[in-house]
Amino acid sequence: MNNFLKRLVLFFSFCVINHAEAARPMLTDDARIVDPKSCQLESWVRDSEHVTEYWALPACNVGENLEVTIGGSLESESGQSSFANELYQMKSIIQPIALNQTGFSIVLGNGRDPKRAMNKAIQDWFLNVPMSYPYNDRLVIHTNLGVTHFTDEHKEKMNWGLSSEYNYNERVDLISEVFNQSSNSTFFQFGLRYWLIKNRAQIDTTYMNSFNRFGEDQSFSVGLRLLSLPFLP
């Protein structure tokens, strides 16, 4: 077994949550990344009235302060399945989050939707600045401000988000947010995260809806998060 395969075995055999908390299942990002030379896997299913989405977003901190994410989704609609989204993203911490200190990070990414514009793959570039403020040892507030360049429309649209994480007890986090991702609708989402095995695996579930078209845009999600020990060279 070569070194690369050994690292893969190490990743999937010894997955363990470290001190960094990822944003999933919230759409509002946080000012955190995974530990140096470590990886994470975020996966979830989102079900709405007409479409079911299956997401997987593996990410690795390839150095000391550069998290790279490459992933996407599969959609099932009217009995037909297709690859719906691709995501390529880099994230770096500007100022780490600490008690009484707001954390800042910067995110640069590229999104592709193969179904748009007569099945031509369209690239949408985005820039986002997540900020995280620890209100106390239980509550953290996150804000996002960013912009997306829509290639086929030749214009830019703003993104924003506001979310909260409340540590209810040693196993449960309560989460909520409002956000707008370059659309005409503002959404809200709330749910919880639960440790299946403390410091090893966590599941989450959420409910999402739109203020503009309440009931028509509602969806539910369930997800699984795993993070690895350091194993990259």
Task: Please give the residue ranges for each predicted region.
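Cleavable N-terminal export/targeting peptides
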Residues: 1-27, 231-233
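Transmembrane beta-barrel domains of Gram-negative outer membranes and organellar outer membranes
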Residues: 21-233
